Amino acid sequence: IAALVIDNGSGMCKAGFAGDDAPRAVFPSIVGRPRHQGVMVGMGQKDSYVGDEAQSKRGILTLKYPIEHGIVTNWDDMEKIWHHTFYNELRVAPEEHPVLLTEAPLNPKANREKMTQIMFETFNSPAMYVAIQAVLSLYASGRTTGIVLDSGDGVTHTVPIYEGYALPHAILRLDLAGRDLTDYLMKILTERGYSFTTTAEREIVRDIKEKLCYVALDFEQEMSNAASSSALEKSYELPDGQVITIGNERFRCPEALFQPSFLGMESAGIHETTYNSIMKCDVDIRKDLYANTVLSGGSTMYPGISDRMQKEISALAPSTMKIKIVAPPERKYSVWIGGSILASLSTFQQMWISKQEYDESGPGIVHRKCF
């Protein structure tokens, strides 16, 4: 029987079957509840909507994301998302398939146990496993050693991995990711006189960001280019037909990844965080990390980001060091793909936590079997 692989991100949930090369279902990790009282009889109004349906009815709903900064904060809503994944997206009976879930690095232990408990007690899974997201991305790139810069919608991590083991003392977390960049773009578009405020309008700005933003190789240079010519300007049509023009916002938005001070944050940018993470590792393995710096997650999809990372890290590292930034084209889904690879390995089959083991040991079993 095929195992299920579910990668629950802060922004998008990716789900599918182990052994496939891409997720079957990709939908927003959103639960929406009606803002207004239903007046039409027989409309069959629901008290909650999940994913794309919530997205399409966003005009009348309040949208909530149960996963914040990579970590589940609302378990009732999370259960709704899983329910939706099994029954509506994949159309499978969860009690018939082992399920591989992913978790953020440095996920609190209690969260891991809660995930395990819900899978076995609510969904009656026959077996499950919890894997760290960044480790799966590295598997997907065909490596067992390297440092993964995983930046999604809710959180960014740098995770050094040696021979398949994450090095927890050197993992760094940066609470700056796609959602913050969307908020920042909303803010700088407001300076242009365009107003975006509601949760529904935020989704429009997210689309603008995904379609038009890019990372400048040299920010100051790009700013002066933008000031002196209109070559960088692009137009975007809003759902109501209004057309807006966006110029230096295109690269000012993702620049915040390298200069978090743009968002009023006192933290190191992604290049410096990656370097700091490498420096926390044993001196003997640093060379391997510099040469295998793997980008993963949706917020690494900006054009120009790998060249910029190469430039910034070269400036920080010893001058003779060989630095290689690996940016696989499918990196938006590399966590899921890594999970699909892992769950279909024959050697992995003894790693599953079975329902029987869970019944004997309780949720704590997850710390012994998943590392």
UniProtKB/Swiss-Prot annotation:
<comment type="function">
    <text>Actins are highly conserved proteins that are involved in various types of cell motility and are ubiquitously expressed in all eukaryotic cells.</text>
</comment>
<comment type="similarity">
    <text>Belongs to the actin family.</text>
</comment>
<dbReference type="InterPro" id="IPR004000">
    <property type="entry name" value="Actin"/>
</dbReference>
<dbReference type="GO" id="GO:0005856">
    <property type="term" value="C:cytoskeleton"/>
</dbReference>
<keyword id="KW-0547">Nucleotide-binding</keyword>
<dbReference type="GO" id="GO:0005524">
    <property type="term" value="F:ATP binding"/>
</dbReference>
<dbReference type="Pfam" id="PF00022">
    <property type="entry name" value="Actin"/>
</dbReference>
<dbReference type="InterPro" id="IPR043129">
    <property type="entry name" value="ATPase_NBD"/>
</dbReference>
<keyword id="KW-0378">Hydrolase</keyword>
<keyword id="KW-0206">Cytoskeleton</keyword>
<keyword id="KW-0067">ATP-binding</keyword>
<dbReference type="InterPro" id="IPR004001">
    <property type="entry name" value="Actin_CS"/>
</dbReference>
<protein>
    <recommendedName>
        <fullName>Actin-5</fullName>
        <ecNumber>3.6.4.-</ecNumber>
    </recommendedName>
</protein>
<dbReference type="GO" id="GO:0005737">
    <property type="term" value="C:cytoplasm"/>
</dbReference>
<keyword id="KW-0963">Cytoplasm</keyword>
<dbReference type="InterPro" id="IPR020902">
    <property type="entry name" value="Actin/actin-like_CS"/>
</dbReference>
<dbReference type="GO" id="GO:0016787">
    <property type="term" value="F:hydrolase activity"/>
</dbReference>
